[in-house]
Amino acid sequence: MWGIHHARLHTTLKIQQWLPLGSRILIALSGGQDSVCLTRLLLDLQPHWQWFLAAVHCDHRWRADSTANANFVRQLAQKWHLPCEVVCAPDLPKTEAAARSWRYQVFESMAKALDCTHVVTAHTQSDRAESLLLHLLRGTSPDGLATLLPSRSLGAIQLVRPLLGMTRAETAAFCQAYGLPIWQDETNHNVAYRRNRLRLELIPYLQQHFNPNLEEVLGQTAELLASDRAYFEAEVERLAPTVIREHPPALDRLRLRELPLALQRRLIQRFLRQHLKRGLNFRVIEAVRALITAGNGSQTASLPGGKHLRVCGRWIELVRPMPPPPAPVPPGQGGRSPPPSPLY
């Protein structure tokens, strides 16, 4: 098979070098139209790139038809002479986030077992647009809107999303044009899930009343934000040693004053991520940023975990919570030493 989408992907891979010649590639194959489209494209391009290709299917055991879905994937892979592993979740994931975390653990471990250098997933431009909208409605930073990067590290493996230039409508048309069998996941039509409601109700409304090319423009926006994110991440890594003191933890506020607002916020965020387990948000970052020009001795309100930051000369220092005072000694026990610790 060879068509316009083969040519487009072939050209993109030559330019971007996401999947170099001779790479060992593990395909995340759910059996849906997007992953079937991706698998067929890679199999058709394989002679030109001399890849090793294998597939993995993750069975979350959420649906009554999950075993039938897994068997469908096995049969399709066998028909296409594609090595395929089906992995069942040992426990039912409680949330979509937990399921996603488990899937990516499977991708990484299976790739290592097969000596694969790359894992590919079939996320499309439509997925990217949906993710951007979801994050925007929930509230996030510009970096949070730079969703579904085309390529990123997954431990020692490289995760690649080759279909970000195709919409879901295009993958459906591809499967139909080439007569490819696909598995219909009925849960994709359940609007109890936020992403499904956005996909089935909000995006069609926005396309009809605001912009018929919504998925394309949102995908382009995510791509522009991703390039900005890559630049700022590199700048933060370059500047961090000049701004962040590790021991004891502190920020150099004189150095921060010299930097643009965007870098101030990102460096503060980087510092706080090292020391806060939870609760990092815009208000916390702005409270710390206010200390850049505050008077000596100024401090933030208590941060998550009971910590706070305080101005001490040129430094904004992290102050850990004081340990609780010792319990009062009961009457009649004053001066009595505690029993010695047991020896092991």
What annotation goes with each model-predicted range?
Residues 1-201:
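Core alpha/beta nucleotide-donor-binding catalytic domains of modification enzymes
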Residues 46, 114, 210, 272-276:
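A broad structural signal for alpha-helix termini and local helix breaks/kinks
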Residues 172-223, 227, 313-314, 320:
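Mid-to-C-terminal catalytic subdomains of enzymes
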Residues 4-34, 54, 89-91, 102, ...:
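AMP-forming adenylation/ATP pyrophosphatase catalytic core
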